[in-house]
Amino acid sequence: MHNVSTTTTGFPLAKILTSTELGDNTIQAANDAANKLFSLTIADLTANQNINTTNAHSTSNILIPELKAPKSLNASSQLTLLIGNLIQILGEKSLTALTNKITAWKSQQQARQQKNLEFSDKINTLLSETEGLTRDYEKQINKLKNADSKIKDLENKINQIQTRLSELDPESPEKKKLSREEIQLTIKKDAAVKDRTLIEQKTLSIHSKLTDKSMQLEKEIDSFSAFSNTASAEQLSTQQKSLTGLASVTQLMATFIQLVGKNNEESLKNDLALFQSLQESRKTEMERKSDEYAAEVRKAEELNRVMGCVGKILGALLTIVSVVAAAFSGGASLALAAVGLALMVTDAIVQAATGNSFMEQALNPIMKAVIEPLIKLLSDAFTKMLEGLGVDSKKAKMIGSILGAIAGALVLVAAVVLVATVGKQAAAKLAENIGKIIGKTLTDLIPKFLKNFSSQLDDLITNAVARLNKFLGAAGDEVISKQIISTHLNQAVLLGESVNSATQAGGSVASAVFQNSASTNLADLTLSKYQVEQLSKYISEAIEKFGQLQEVIADLLASMSNSQANRTDVAKAILQQTTA
């Protein structure tokens, strides 16, 4: 059960019912209070009815109708009846107040109309009198002009007679006649002057009356204008005061819609300008980071390629030396020596019969297909490595060519060492043939420095091999010499592998530095890309927000239109009730 208070919005119901002067605010508050009380009472009655129905259903599934005497109204029913009567009284009171306002407004309009008629009559009367006096005044002015003209004519005639009299003989009859005419004209002139004086006096009187009437007319016109302005101001003030709460809310809603629309548009423009500026800056930053990333990647790739070539070359050399060392520890050298001896004998027989060495012809493709490309590859690798270290291009090319030729020669020397301990004569013959080919290659590579070196290269290689064997102990015990050679070569392999590992590690570190810089630039580029994507998202959100605000504005306009339509319908209904 709701606790219903008899006071709503600070206006007791008893005071409202007994009040003889109720304003719009009071009536509106009373209507709201009555409607709220009515709703609460209906809710209580519905709840009680539901409780009774539930109890009846719980007692029996079938309800048998019973005839009972009508009950008197309980407290809730009496309150509902009271509220209904209150709503009816307040409605009649509101309608009565509106009728009284309309009646007062009609009376005010009638009084204003009557006053306007009075002003109109006075102004029309004064205007008619002024027009009459104006016509009389014009007539008197014409009379004055005629009188002045008549007096002037008489004066001219008198002057002519006086001139004639002065010329005549005093005793002549004509002079007497002219004297009598002069006297008559003088009498007429005096009469004309007297008439003019009367006309002038009357004209002045009419002029005075016309001036008074004109002033009265101007005064009435000013009074009428002041009254009209005051009435218009009062009517405008009354119209403004007569605006209801709904109309004021409608006006406020229209102002609010205008402000929201303007602010929404300006906000969207500012957001778009800001986002565009940020996108331009991010775009420039991304282009710069992209260029830096590409440069770092190119550096890393170039270093990897150079170090890879160096590693491959060193690895190949170490592999060859390892094979040579392994040959000294097993029986592979004997088979290789036998093959070498057979080749040398066969080559001698063929050369004696035909005059051509097939060994030289057989080694030619190897030099063309293997040794020369190897020397060129080594020369290019050393040249690029030196250029990377800052050496001049011409000097780097020359030094690289020499180092490449030396490296290729070392490969051939290792091949000669392979069979040197088994068959010195075969090795010498093999070295002689290889020496000729190497001599030709080195002569083409550095002609000024090695111009006469090819003819003596076979002896030089043979003597170098002999000195190498002697240095390593090849003149002593053959088995011990092989072991010593194998040991030294294995040590050289280990040292070379260490150098190769260090070189590759250094290259890897340098490459990692470039890759780290490239990764940093790539991270900055990715971050800038993400920021650009976020800016695009913010732009979409700003446009979506603008659309949502436009929908809110449309809803407000629809609400305002509906409110105005409802107000018009209520006004029509009230007008119909008033005129009924």
From Swiss-Prot:
The chain crosses the membrane at residues 313-333, 399-419. Residues 51-72 are annotated as: IpgC chaperone binding domain 2. One of its GO terms (cellular component) is extracellular region. Its main location: secreted. Induction: Synthesis of this immunogen is repressed at 30 degrees Celsius and restored at 37 degrees Celsius. The keyword Cell inner membrane does not apply. It is found in: Secreted; Host membrane; Host cell; Host nucleus. It comes from the Bacteria. Pfam families: SseC, T3SSipB. Disruption phenotype: Deletion mutant shows fast constitutive secretion and displays increased adhesion to HeLa cells. Mutant is non-hemolytic in the presence of sheep red blood cell (RBC). Mutant displays normal secretons. The keyword Cell inner membrane does not apply. InterPro entries: BipB-like_C (IPR006972), IpaB/BipB/SctE_N (IPR032391), T3SS_SctE/BipB (IPR003895). It is a multi-pass membrane protein. Keywords: Coiled coil, Host membrane, Host nucleus, Membrane, Plasmid, Secreted, Transmembrane, Transmembrane helix, Virulence. Residues 15-45 are annotated as: IpgC chaperone binding domain 1. The immediate N-terminus is needed for recognition by the secretion apparatus and chaperone binding. The N-terminal region is necessary for interaction with IpaD/SctA and the sequential maturation of the T3SS needle tip. The C-terminal half is key to the activities needed for formation of an active translocon and possibly for translocation itself. The extreme C-terminus is required for efficient needle tip binding, and its absence also affects regulation of secretion and adhesion to and possibly invasion of host cells. Belongs to the SctE/SipB/YopB family. This is Type 3 secretion system translocon protein SctE.
